[in-house]
Regions:
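Small-residue-centered hinge/linker elements
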Residues: 1-81, 90-97, 101-142
Length: 142
């Protein structure tokens, strides 16, 4: 029988976007201090059957990433709620670590999903490159 009074399923949603590190009033980004209350509130919603997290981050601080990851897992365990993560454009390095806090992870086939703790270092020869006419080409796969 149809009823207007049936309880609708609710999903709590957290959006994490930006570089992971010391964020502040005038500095955008993701850090544990700025997300702690938001995460707590999402998991404490009694009507919510699960928590969805949308992440769009190239990574950043490994410490902040790990603090957020651990806190999400702790809150999920305490509340007995599943965590579903949706990677938007990028979930790399620390963003990927936070994504791993999910019980399920979904990503677009065009999303950049990266590994944890990758650092690339190189030398720059910009003047020499200009002088001898070297052209830059980028190839990606995956």
């Amino acid at each position: 029988m149809f009823s207007f009074f049936k309880k609708k399923k609710t999903v709590a949603h957290i959006k994490l976007s930006g570089v992971i590190g010391n964020a502040g009033k005038f500095k955008q980004g993701i850090d544990f201090a700025g997300q702690e209350e938001i995460i707590k509130k999402a998991f404490s919603l009694k009507k919510a059957s699960c928590v969805a997290i949308t992440i769009n981050s190239p990574g950043g601080s490994p410490v902040q990433s790990h603090l957020i990851y651990n806190f999400i897992r702790q809150e999920a365990k305490n509340s007995k709620k599943r965590v579903i993560v949706f990677a938007e454009d990028v979930a790399a390095s620390g963003g990927y670590l936070i994504s791993c806090a999910g019980d399920e992870i979904y990503a677009n086939s065009s999303s950049i999903i990266g590994s944890i703790g990758v650092i690339y270092s190189s030398f720059g020869f910009t003047e020499l490159i200009k002088k001898i006419g070297v052209e830059r080409r980028v190839h990606t796969a995956g």
